[in-house]
Amino acid sequence: MIQVLLVTICLAAFPYQGSSIILESGKVNDYEVVYPQRLAPLPEGAVQQKYEDTMQYEFKVNGEPVVLHLEKNKGLFSKDYSEIHYSPDGRRITTHPLVEDHCYYRGHIRNDADSTASISACHGLKGHFKLRGETYLIEPMKISNSEAHAVYKYENVEKEDEAHKMCGVTQNWESYEPIKKASQLIVSTEFQRYMEIVIVVDHSMVKKYNGDSDKIKAWVYEMINTITESYSYLYIDIILSGLEIWSEKDLINVETSAENTLKSFGEWRAKDLIHRISHDNAQLLTATDFDGPTIGLAYVASMCDPKRSVGVVQDHSSVNRLVAITLAHEMAHNLGVRHDEGSCSCGSGYTCIMSPVINSEVIKYFSDCSYIQCREYISKENPPCILNKPLRTDTVSTPVSGNELLEAEKDYD
């Protein structure tokens, strides 16, 4: 039986109106300081897991009490999830971390049907939640020996660059066809698909994060946890099959030209990566500043193609969610989804994921057009690689010694 932990957190909130603070997401104004306090221990005799399957937190937002319900995202990793990095002498080192007891959750606010949440509970609470149409971010404050967290709206994060950023896909890349009305599209549970992806982190990212592989991994995990929620509306499960870090040098020529980099990355995947890790799609994450306003590029309607089921994404923001949405955008191109036009909608007042321009708004949803285009692409092309449902990590429990298994690429000392 799954152990369920009901944790009540009393968050005493003290708004700092007009003040600012430097957080991981940047300089933030108008935030609330909150102190999580666990009030309800586990039942007597219960065995506490490091990260429980279900958690609930109670706190106040703007003086109003809310209950945040979280459930572990058990489909986040594939059962054979692997991580790859390289030694200084060029050896490829493959490990299989034990990811069953991870700390990434999805959830909602109790009594708010439209609420959502994506939270990391690894070191305090970090992530975002939607409450009554407003999106809030939460993260631990950088105070020694303190449980203080900051809760704030994204609009209160000072923007380093106000210029609009864009996806590099243009009409020359996209094939425009008439879009069916939603009433013309038959949808059933048979349309559920499963996309196993590999994220490749280039050497510019390693430099940006000062070689801190743990920080890079956490950044990627949080991104994938965020986009799994967005893709659930398209009836597509996103599963992370692998993370490769080019720790010593790039294995392709990563250029400021997004188009050239995409081409090189696709060719490398077809001749190398696809033979090492079972996956359906690969995305390159880079700190390289692409030419012009471009922050991402992907082939359109290319899922399962060895060279073309790929995308490239610039790590363009200190706000994880914004980079995650860019990743979700490029992956959707691979699934036959085009840029939104004027008639497309994902709710009144919202900018949708497939907008060609990425601005400072918090984006979360695919539009009705994206939904229809994705369904049409799957119905027409039926890409075979995303048909199979992979086993979840919690279905396999193989005892091992240590935290990792090293494959043959690494010489044992």
UniProtKB/Swiss-Prot annotation:
Q: What does this protein do?
A: Snake venom zinc metalloprotease that may activate prothrombin.
Q: Which InterPro entries match?
A: MetalloPept_cat_dom_sf, Peptidase_M12B, Peptidase_M12B_N, Reprolysin_adamalysin
Q: What PROSITE patterns does the annotation carry? A: ADAM_MEPRO (PS50215), ZINC_PROTEASE (PS00142)
Source organism per entry reads Deinagkistrodon acutus (Hundred-pace snake)
Which keywords are on file for this protein? Blood coagulation cascade activating toxin, Calcium, Disulfide bond, Hemostasis impairing toxin, Hydrolase, Metal-binding, Metalloprotease, Protease, Prothrombin activator, Secreted, Signal, Toxin, Zinc, Zymogen
**How far does the signal peptide extend, from start to end residue?**
1-20
What's a single GO BP term from this record? Answer: proteolysis
Q: Lineage of the native species?
A: Eukaryota, Metazoa, Chordata, Craniata, Vertebrata
Protein name in UniProt: Snake venom metalloproteinase AaPA
The entry's free-text remark on the cofactor is: Binds 1 zinc ion per subunit.
